[in-house]
Regions:
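Bacterial Sec-dependent N-terminal signal peptides
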Residues: 1-37
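Pepsin/retropepsin-fold aspartyl endopeptidases
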Residues: 22-417
Length: 417
């Protein structure tokens, strides 16, 4: 006989229990979440405001960056990262060997330490008309993690002291005057710095997992994560989620971020609450990692772009505040999934992550496969934004996989959840 126990965990620090410190929560619409349309986003982008810096959003935020005045780079912005990161291959292609390079090990979302280099020289770069000089950069194999189209990442050093608007729907970033006030409809969320370095922010988020378990937690703001809400394995142990959840899907990544392999357990949360807004039936995950960032106990998990994409976002990096306003895509939940995480390569898409028991898995797709076409389309015909939309569409996939020197065609339906 199953005994039901109502366990409500309140883990939020008293200083950030609510959003009342700098704003007032706005009532949200009671409309049911809507599903994404096939092979499309919900709405089309509008013209950019004056001074805006264009970005491409496809799980990550992609920017055109100019390094040392002459070297154009395609970079991802990541609040979970402090300084600039440069891909090893890009570094060798564009910069002379440096006597200031030193070997190092770094820790990220993966289960292990990652070998890298630390360059102690000054690095100048610009995003739009905004210039920054950082003392030092980390050089590592980012393309293994993010794909051949990524040259590097920039992070919190660029944002230090700035107030910045991020618009996921219209695709831009706008550096605001420090005294600028967000428009009507925004709600301020008082955040806290994770430590005295004031380089990583944690914000309060509530999650009702089901009728038995709820959590008011402190989540690291990680705009380098494409996920919505990820619970650390330390929280999973405290909540005893393994005993509570039944409909859980295991997803394993060969390269799940800096630090190598990663295992996530995917499930649907009844409700996620942030800044007074409720997102229903959201796909979230908890980590199975025993080491690395996702096993930390100084915060409860990650808030990624999969949650933030429902809002217009203004971050005051000087005051450690985040202002949120539901955008035109608010509540539009993704109902279909390919079951795979694909890393773009020059000659195809590498199957880096795969959900066990998914339709793709049961049809014969394996981690490490290289897909050379999807429904007759090659990588040259599908950019990152289109690939994201295709992955969440209802449309069946027919993929060609290059395996053991020969091509194999596999067709499967998307998983619906």
């Amino acid at each position: 006989m199953r005994v039901k126990s109502n366990i409500i965990f309140a883990l939020t620090l008293s200083a950030i229990l609510g959003t009342t410190g700098c704003g007032k929560a706005k009532k949200t619409s009671s409309n049911e979440p809507q599903a994404l349309t096939q092979d499309e986003e919900i709405v089309q982008a509008r013209p950019l405001p004056e001074g805006a810096i264009p970005l491409d959003y496809a799980g990550h935020l992609y920017f055109d960056v100019m390094m040392r005045d002459t070297v154009a780079a395609r970079m991802i912005f990541d609040t979970g990262n402090t300084e600039i990161l440069i891909d090893t291959h890009f570094f060798k292609e564009h910069f002379a060997p440096s006597p200031t390079l030193q070997r190092t090990l770094i820790q990220g979302a993966g289960n292990s330490l990652e070998a890298a280099y630390r360059d102690t020289a000054e690095w100048e770069y610009s995003v739009g008309e905004h210039h920054t000089t950082e003392q030092g950069a980390t050089v590592l194999d980012l393309r293994k993690i993010l794909g051949y189209h990524v040259d590097g990442m920039f992070g919190m050093e660029f944002m230090r002291g700035r107030k910045v608007e991020f618009n996921y729907v219209d695709g831009y970033m706008l550096i605001l005057p420090q005294d600028a006030q967000p428009e009507e409809g925004y709600v301020c969320v008082k955040c806290k710095w994770l430590d005295n370095r004031q380089a990583r922010m944690v914000m309060p988020v509530g999650i009702k997992i089901n009728d038995e378990v709820a959590l008011d937690g402190n989540f690291l703001v990680d705009m380098g994560s494409s996920g919505s809400l990820s619970l650390n394995s330390s929280v999973v142990a405290r909540l005893k989620l393994n005993r509570v959840l039944s409909n859980v899907r295991k997803k394993t990544y060969d390269t799940g971020g800096v630090g190598g392999s990663r295992t996530d357990y995917l499930f649907k949360a009844d409700k996620v609450t942030v800044a007074g807004n409720e997102l229903l039936d959201m796909q979230v995950n908890y980590s199975g990692n025993t080491q690395g960032m996702m096993a930390e106990d100084s915060f409860d998990g990650l808030v990624g772009n999969g949650l933030l994409e429902h809002f217009d976002v203004v971050i005051d990096f000087a005051k450690c505040e985040i202002w949120l306003r539901p955008n035109r895509n608010f509540g539009a939940m993704k109902r279909y999934d390919s079951g795979m995480t694909l890393t773009p390569q020059a000659d195809g898409w590498l199957v880096n992550g795969l959900t066990e028991g998914s339709n793709a898995h049961r049809a014969g797709v394996m981690r490490g496969d290289v897909i050379t076409s999807i429904n007759g389309l090659t990588p040259r015909e599908v950019d990152i934004k289109r690939l994201k939309a295709m992955g969440y569409s209802e449309e069946d996939w027919s993929v060609v996989i290059k395996r053991n020197g020969s091509d194999e065609k596999i067709t499967f339906k998307k998983d619906k959840y």
